[in-house]
Amino acid sequence: MAPNLRKSHPLLKMINNSLIDLPTPSNISVWWNFGSLLGICLTTQILTGLLLAAHYTADTTLAFSSVAHTCRNVQHGWLIRNLHANGASFFFICIYMHIGRGLYYGSYLYKETWNTGVILLLTLMATAFVGYVLPWGQMSFWGATVITNLFSAIPYIGQTIVEWAWGGFSVDNPTLTRFFTLHFLLPFMIMGLTLIHLTFLHESGSNNPLGIVSNCDKIPFHPYFSLKDTLGFMLMFLPLMTLALFSPNLLGDPENFTPANPLVTPPHIKPEWYFLFAYGFLRSIPNKLGGVLALAASMLILFLAPLLHKSKQRTMTFRPLSQLLFWTLTANLLILTWVGSQPVEHPFIIIGQLASLTYFTILLILFPMTGALENKMLNY
């Protein structure tokens, strides 16, 4: 009998082993869809991004006009831009849900996969930040100024680092040029990291909602999960297209319709919605260096997740106390997101500080304690 090409060809064999004949736990739920959705988001963003880059000019005098030109004069330019801008929002929705799934079901115990995932998150955040600066509107300019300025909080070398990043003494043409370079480069870096992420995942195989070894009950990825993923794609593209076609500017800042002006500061400088929770951490500490450390810690704490796991059970499926904490953490992050969008005044300052404190308390103290307590409860 002739050998099956997809199983013998050196390249097709790799695709076959990771997308077609991949042994997959039969009981993985819809929460396992977000990985493939992130892949689709990345592909969409790279394609729309390439088309936008073809019409973009990375120069402070022309950037704003070139984006306006793309929307007005380029065939379907408005659609490409709207898909790219709102696609970023969906990218973040998917990655946050993907991370939430990982925390809930103990997927972080696959340490290499988890760590590459956290690095992917940080790279994605950097990409989104530099991308937001490119249209060169008011919020683009002031967002870049405020966030890059945070590096000046680093003792001794901070100011030098900031001026080196700016390529001058303020955010100007060199800054825009290098941000465009980075925004073009980073998605391809994300692609490479994604391959590493998947390589580590396929070493161990997927986790499942019960958190138990599922080797005795695996089914091929195709057709079962390829079909389930296709449903996921449709359910994501529907709201994305709805948003991009009906209210493309819903999630944007009206301030960005004004070209960047270094002489006029907007009344409220705030990032896109998907960074508001991090902005909440930053603002809840009155000291500059303290705020920067809180912001960094809020992300880097994810690296500690495997070390803070004290339960004998992997997932939270049968751990009601941990579930309660998990959903409290989720609500807490939503509160931080809301606070981040509000002006710095009473009562938002104290709410932000309490929410920040709660976030770290839950992750560093309450999760491990609850895990240990539930272990004890198993004995009775």
UniProtKB/Swiss-Prot annotation:
Its cofactor is heme b. InterPro entries: Cyt_b/b6_C, Cyt_b/b6_C_sf, Cyt_b/b6_N, Cytb/b6-like_sf, Cytochrome_b, Cytochrome_b_C_euk/bac, Cytochrome_b_N_euk/bac, Di-haem_cyt_TM. Its main location: mitochondrion. Heme b b562 binds at residues 84, 183. It comes from the Eukaryota. Pfam families: Cytochrom_B_C, Cytochrome_B. It is a multi-pass membrane protein. The keyword Transcription regulation does not apply. Signal peptide: none annotated. It is found in: Mitochondrion inner membrane. The chain crosses the membrane at residues 34-54, 78-99, 114-134, 179-199, 227-247, 289-309, 321-341, 348-368. A ubiquinone binds at residue 202. GO terms for molecular function: metal ion binding; ubiquinol-cytochrome-c reductase activity. Heme 1 (or BL or b562) is low-potential and absorbs at about 562 nm, and heme 2 (or BH or b566) is high-potential and absorbs at about 566 nm. The cytochrome bc1 complex contains 11 subunits: 3 respiratory subunits (MT-CYB, CYC1 and UQCRFS1), 2 core proteins (UQCRC1 and UQCRC2) and 6 low-molecular weight proteins (UQCRH/QCR6, UQCRB/QCR7, UQCRQ/QCR8, UQCR10/QCR9, UQCR11/QCR10 and a cleavage product of UQCRFS1). This cytochrome bc1 complex then forms a dimer. This is Cytochrome b. The gene is MT-CYB.
